[in-house]
Amino acid sequence: MKCPYCGHLDNKVIDSRINKDATITRRRRSCLACDQRFTTYERLEVMFPMLVKKDGRREAWDRHKLVVGIEKACEKRAVSRDKIDEFVDDIEHMLQDYGAKEISSSIVGEWVMERLPALDEVAYVRFASVYRQFKDVDEFMSELKNLLDARGGGDD
């Protein structure tokens, strides 16, 4: 592993830790040339199905896109980055379990919509407003009513 400080290739691992679900190894390394320490992460490369967009285009799965979308929905909410990472990990596990080479992006979107209220209800409403592309206030209110009904808080 190349040292990010001096570019030297020789270093030693001084600590290794595996995350809770044994999918990522974090290693602390020390450069043998400059003695600087740095951290590397190893993650198993998993092949995810290709996403088929509404217009028929095919696109490779991009974890970062979902993370950014969830972060935007959770902006100024008490949702930690760890919780967001766990949420996206769960979606990725579902993609792995799907068992096909392609999946409609709308299926993935629905998975996100089904699980987001458990993470944060306000984030759900924010995400839904973009994902569902509400045309008017009535559609937005209908989605809010569905959320309230799902948690047993509807007034009807």
Curated annotation (Swiss-Prot):
Keywords on record: ATP-binding, DNA-binding, Metal-binding, Nucleotide-binding, Repressor, Transcription, Transcription regulation, Zinc, Zinc-finger
Cofactor: Zn(2+)
Signal peptide extent: none
KW Nucleus (keyword) present: no
MF-aspect GO terms: ATP binding; DNA binding; zinc ion binding
Free-text remark on how the cofactor is bound: Binds 1 zinc ion.
A Pfam family reported for this protein in Swiss-Prot or TrEMBL: ATP-cone
Record-annotated ATP-cone domain positions: 49-139
Entry keyword Metal-binding: yes
GO biological process: negative regulation of DNA-templated transcription
Zinc finger (unnamed): 3-34
HAMAP family registered for this protein in UniProt: NrdR
Family: Belongs to the NrdR family.
General function of this protein: Negatively regulates transcription of bacterial ribonucleotide reductase nrd genes and operons by binding to NrdR-boxes.
UniProt name for this protein: Transcriptional repressor NrdR
